[in-house]
Amino acid sequence: PGNCTNNPCLTGTNAIDTELGTTPKVVTARSLTVTGRVQGVGFRPFVYRLATTHGLTGWVLNRLGQVEIRVQGAADAIRLFEHELIALAPPLARPQIDASTPAETGQLYEFTIRESSTAGAASIHVPPDLFTCNDCLHELNDPADRRYRYPFINCTQCGPRYTLIRSLPYDRPNTTMAGFTLCPQCLAEYTNPTDRRFHAEPLACPACGPALSFASRDGTTAGGNEAALRACIAALRGGDVVAVKGIGGYHLLCDAGSNAAVTRLRQRKPRPHKPLAVMFPAPPASPLDAVLQYVILAPEARELLLSPARPIVLATQRPGTPLSGRIAPGLNEIGVMLPYSPLHHLLLNDYGAPLVATSANISGEPVLTDNREVDERLAHVADACLHHDRPVERPADDPVYRSICNTARPIRLGRGATPQEESLPFHLPQPVIAVGGHMKNTVALAWESRLVVSPHIGDMGNARSLAVFEQTIADLQSLYGVTAERVIHDAHPGYATTRWAERSGLPRHAVLHHHAHAATACDLSAGDAPWLVFTWDGVGYGADGTLWGGEALLGHPGNWERVASLRPFHLPGGERAGREPWRSAAAVC
């Protein structure tokens, strides 16, 4: 029941009378199916507000990753509603109206948000993890707000998504927040369709949500958010290496201006030469001021740093900065990033200076996510740990981008940028899983005309990478409700991914390493004209059983001819040359 003066009601003649003696408006109804990025971005509350603004009745619900809407009211109001559904969508939403069909009018007196449904087929889209929005940052820094300095503040426009979803539909019981019971105040926000935290599944506050804890190797402990933060800052100021749990796993943090701290981190990890990323303070009013004191950023690089993924961006270092020369030895570029979670904002703003922020792992492995595992495996690396008790369902390392020819190019996909969903320019006859190469592994699932790429996993020469690799393959199929019927793998017979493909029992298709690289350079919409592609990429198994390196390939994806290459030479150590280039240099001397 509703109020007919505020919510248009049906009469027996399917008309709306707004004033006595006026011509009734004919009531119509439509059913809409909306796909795209509509999960975890506040889309249903937006639909509710839009419908009530236009005086429409009906309902909206989630169904396995898509949104279904029934609206009823004046025809012109429904037309405007459909237009604004796309034009005024929340900033992080990417809605697409897949179907809009006439529906029977019925006894609908108000607009409601219904419980999610798992019935029927759907076009599932899994949301990535989202950086902290400006509204939450304002509350985080407002002493009058009940979430002041709360490290896990979030709303429908920000917070973890992919790394806490256990299954779909995206509802709180299906996430790692299921174990945190909402307090009365949070529950009131969660159930209020006009609140920006309506059905914000990671919703929490200091009274009912996750909390921090600190422990160091010397026995120092601190419980409670503020005490743990103070202890962490003190450890960093003392030159310690601290493992800090974020959204997709742990970082190893240390003072970016201390040669001694950075050297200790390199020796312990061990990571003797590879560059390390640096995280900078980012006050809401001027988020780029600090980083611009240290690096030169082109306009597109600035946009990248502030983009929703909040990636690591490669940038040219300014001369004479106080950053440690051990961060990127021998290079004039460093990877810079901004805080992406409330916890990182608090740490960087309290510390007041840049911090090295590298993945907390054993080099080459996926980032660690479990509190106990970090305590055990990084005891010789980290002097202290800043834990929290919100479980991370799956690891997601930081994404890495650089600007090439004024265009953002991913070097590594990860937290905030994945799952990366793409449309294919063709239709697949059966679902396919592509399992990637041996180094810097990533996997992809494709079906119909859709493609989903996983986060970066790591090098496949260790047990943990293989375990995460297998978990990722299972997760993608489970989350998207798709079972692969064919596997595509690298042609190299010795790769762990090839051996997995052999054990899978699925029909297999092997692809030469350099053929795969060549295919990525092609514009599939350019027709059948042949491409000449130069693939200069370390070593890869070739058609003749040798290890290829610099190749010139002519053709198009699926049909390549090797028309030129570097002169073959003996390779001391075989594939070790891919990680130790001096071996190639020695071979040609």
Predicted regions span which residues?
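Two-metal-ion RNase H-like nuclease active-site motif
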Residues: G40, P429-G436, L532-V539
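Glycine-rich phosphate-binding loop plus the immediately following alpha-helix
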Residues: V278, P284, H387, R464, ...
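Conserved phosphate-binding/catalytic loops in two-lobed NTP-binding clefts
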Residues: D490, G505-H517
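Hard-cation-handling environments
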Residues: T498, L554, C589
